[in-house]
């Protein structure tokens, strides 16, 4: 599971997910990319599930880059616990996703296979996505 090795603070405030992705919004490493078109949170488990799905589809050919990292801790209180008595303990880690954010990149496979792999991976994610190709500058 992806999570930071160490953080400055154990727990963070909720915050608001607004705006568009200013960084990581282009295909930088691979030839094809999976880009988010809606906003939301992706957990470390979802990132890993999508990665496994893509890896299985492309078999041994090609390379995959994960362009998101879950760096925000989400806390929760146990069931049937009264309110108050402090913030709950960290349950899992998420990556805040904004529209336009590149989630995964891939190279070394045919476009058809890349599309299939990204479609399978997108089914595992809670945000809407689209397939993009690298633009030649």
UniProtKB/Swiss-Prot annotation:
A single GO BP: translation
GO cellular component: cytosolic large ribosomal subunit
Domain of life, per lineage: Bacteria
Record's keyword annotation contains Lipid metabolism: no
Chain ranges passing through the membrane: none
A Pfam family the protein falls into: Ribosomal_L16
GO terms, molecular function: rRNA binding; structural constituent of ribosome; tRNA binding
Key words of the record: Ribonucleoprotein, Ribosomal protein, RNA-binding, rRNA-binding, tRNA-binding
Keyword Chloroplast applies: no
PROSITE patterns: RIBOSOMAL_L16_1, RIBOSOMAL_L16_2
CDD domains: Ribosomal_L16_L10e
InterPro entries: Ribosomal_uL16, Ribosomal_uL16_bact-type, Ribosomal_uL16_CS, Ribosomal_uL16_dom, Ribosomal_uL16_sf
UniProt xrefs under SUPFAM superfamilies: Ribosomal protein L16p/L10e
Biological function: Binds 23S rRNA and is also seen to make contacts with the A and possibly P site tRNAs.
Subunit structure comment from the entry: Part of the 50S ribosomal subunit.
NCBIfam families (UniProt xref): rplP_bact
Family per record: Belongs to the universal ribosomal protein uL16 family.
Name recorded for this polypeptide: Large ribosomal subunit protein uL16
High-level lineage: Bacteria, Pseudomonadati, Pseudomonadota, Gammaproteobacteria, Pseudomonadales
